[in-house]
């Protein structure tokens, strides 16, 4: 029977999983329905659908891993299951980060005005460039996750069953270091790309603001508003990633830390917040998704009001 801490963990993870899958599933459903309706799909919709699907996979594998850890700890002795979880987790995590960086790059190319020939060429070829980046992100995530599947890494973390199931960590320095580098590679580059996008957007905004001040209009134009929305979106992602990434590093190093099981439980709860909460930020930042979300809320509110029993 789960302890009090384990019961709290299960409740929190189940709640976060429900919210996260609902939010990301809503993004996929609305964009796919619009795609079928118009028989056409925009570049931003492709990015959002790819990101939402990767987030759903990430949420599922984190939650399943946590439930297996608590309810069926003996399954960690199954190398096949461990291999599948490791590969899917690595792929979903890396693809989620890379697709988010694609979103930041899209904001940069779509909104920023930078007087450089290469940047101007990227803006002209934005559809081809972004599709190439999306495909490259998928392939990079796939290569990293497949390369991670090696029997030598099973020595990093192993659960052995004696009279009672106990946690036993057997660390091999060389394989562990290599695994750590592989796991973390997928997070550093997207983070750097988002930072670059943020600073270039900020530079473009400052430059645009100076031009507005020269004309002394005194009002914000649509370009300024677009800059501000894009910068806010990138800042929110960076803040969430700053919380998510260190926790992810700790989780991948939990074999080196006493009470590794408790560390993994806390890490699961924190890491699930990132893909769950960011989906609603994306919904409210996109006019089509926001309109569909508010329409759904009005429908639910009206439905609950009609079902409310009459009290004389």
Swiss-Prot record:
The alphabetized UniProt keywords are: G-protein coupled receptor, Glycoprotein, Membrane, Receptor, Sensory transduction, Taste, Transducer, Transmembrane, Transmembrane helix
The record, for PANTHER family, names: TASTE RECEPTOR TYPE 2, TASTE RECEPTOR TYPE 2 MEMBER 9
Q: Which residues lie on this side of the membrane: Extracellular?
A: 1-9, 73-86, 147-180, 258-261
Glycosylation positions?
164
Tell me which GO cellular component terms the UniProt record holds. Answer: membrane; plasma membrane
Report membrane topology.
Answer: Multi-pass membrane protein
What name does UniProt use for this protein?
Taste receptor type 2 member 9
Gene that encodes it: TAS2R9
Q: What this chain does, per the record? A: Gustducin-coupled receptor implicated in the perception of bitter compounds in the oral cavity and the gastrointestinal tract. Signals through PLCB2 and the calcium-regulated cation channel TRPM5.
Chain ranges passing through the membrane: 10-32, 53-72, 87-109, 129-146, 181-203, 235-257, 262-284
